[in-house]
Amino acid sequence: MISAKLVKELRDRTGAGMMECKKALEEANGDIEKAIEVLRKRGIAKAAKKASRETGEGIIASYVHFNKKIGVLVELNCETDFVARTEEFQELGNKIAMHVAAMSPRWVKREDVPQEVIEKEKEIYREQLKDSGKPEHVIEKIIEGKLNKFFEENCLYEQKFAFDEEKMVEDMIKEAIAKIGENIKVSRFVKFTVGE
């Protein structure tokens, strides 16, 4: 039997509905950490269903570093004006803007990286490996791994989130989609640095 106290604790920690929390706890045999994992998996599944929905509303979130030498603007979109006005959505925008200030991504998603940049990176990696003596198929695998690392470092959605290194920015957005119940996406961002 799952106690109401445990359900409330899970609900407070995840923002999920009461029945979802109860089911997750039952599935996890009362283990709250496992229940959180169950909810996260379900949340990501929910987020995937919402990903194709139109996001015509949203906010421009901003962050200016205390020294006034770094500033960021982020366009964070959602489906309705109601959600765009919520404190939770605006806080998400603010956190993403601070993340951009700290981590300096160059693109939102890997699909946004120009093909010529990808080809240039591959060329650099191939040049680094040309005298390695490794077979071509091994070199291709190494290049693929290095390219994935490049995306992790330069694409916002694939970066480890500055406030929780356990998650990528994309995971955090998917959790927000599951919690809020609307599709959310970062359309674009710009970072300004004095002197650059």
Curated annotation (Swiss-Prot):
InterPro entries: EF-Ts_dimer_sf, Transl_elong_EFTs/EF1B, Transl_elong_EFTs/EF1B_dimer, Transl_elong_Ts_CS, UBA-like_sf
Listed GO CC annotations: cytoplasm
Pfam families in the record: EF_TS (PF00889)
Ranges for region Involved in Mg(2+) ion dislocation from EF-Tu: 80-83
Keywords for this protein: Cytoplasm, Elongation factor, Protein biosynthesis
Residue spans crossing the bilayer: none
Gene3D superfamilies the UniProt entry points to: 1.10.286.20, DNA helicase RuvA subunit, C-terminal domain (1.10.8.10), Elongation factor Ts, dimerisation domain (3.30.479.20)
One annotated GO molecular function: translation elongation factor activity
SUPFAM superfamilies in UniProt: Elongation factor Ts (EF-Ts), dimerisation domain, UBA-like
Disulphide bridges, residue numbers: none
Function: Associates with the EF-Tu.GDP complex and induces the exchange of GDP to GTP. It remains bound to the aminoacyl-tRNA.EF-Tu.GTP complex up to the GTP hydrolysis stage on the ribosome.
NCBIfam families associated with the record: tsf
Alphabetical list of HAMAP family matching this protein: EF_Ts
Protein name listed in UniProt: Elongation factor Ts
Organism: Thermosipho melanesiensis (strain DSM 12029 / CIP 104789 / BI429)
